[in-house]
Amino acid sequence: MSDTFFTDAPHWTWWILLYFFVGGIAGTAFMLVSLLDWSATGSRQLPARPIVRLGYYMSFIGVLISGFLLTVDLNRPLRFWHMLIQNHTGQPMFKAWVPMSVGSWGLMVFGLFTFLAALSVLGEDRPGLRLLQSSPVRALRRPVPRTIIAVLGSIAGLFLAGYTGVLLAVTNRPVWADSYLLGLLFLVSGASTGAAALILLALRRQADRGTVGWLVWFDRNVLILELLVLIAFLISLGSVARVYLSWWGLLLLIGVIGVGILWPLFKERGGAHAPRQLMQSASLVLFGGFLLRMVVLFSSEQIHVIGSGVTGR
């Protein structure tokens, strides 16, 4: 039996689950709209801009929500800033060997780039606001600053999406610490849910069909990759995978794989792009991504050992 079965659970709550879910969407959505903005040149650039702006807004709001969720989960929320600033000196406090410190700084850095990106595109939606047409804000729209924000923000966003899985992997608990693929799984799942969230926004705003089609193409391919990584993750668990010979495993099989991955792939077969069908598929992908994190988080949380046997609560 893996020694991870003889450790105490950290007793994380639904706040952390929501943080994992929202953070993954925010991080990958930023990367996707940055890639979309970079790839949409010439006649394609103008139709793609509304989705780019929406994606940057969504990422910024997602960071704010993530920060709130992470803070509320602490036993003493008002002391969250102690993870970033030293109490007595007021200097920045970064501990590379502490996952929560790395994650907190990663969230703050990503938040900075989402703020700059959202501020830069807000002037396109609110051209009448004098502040948004000031020299510093207009400078953010120039090619070089815009590219720097997009590239560095995408890196920070991908880090945030994958970090949530790595945070679990370095916690010595069953399932979490028994596979090296958890960070990759959460990253790929975040990419699928990020694309799904953008598809829903694009369809509600009646966005350009070419832009929606690109997002659907990306989501379909990353769903296939997610399925492969999930299978590899379960195989990598070895004997620990028997944890899922329970209702958690049933939820993983039916809810995540069946409803959240295979059904959307089936509905999108043949490249059908009917708006209603795409909205249903995107909603199922989001549902599956949320269930995946719930299964991984709470299935391990509810494992405890009595004598020589493993029991789930």
Functional labels for PLM-detected ranges:
Residues T13, F20-I25, A40-T41, P47, ...:
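Long, contiguous internal "core" modules enriched in hydrophobic/ aromatic residues
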Residues I25-I85, T89-G106, F113:
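Membrane helical hairpin/interfacial module
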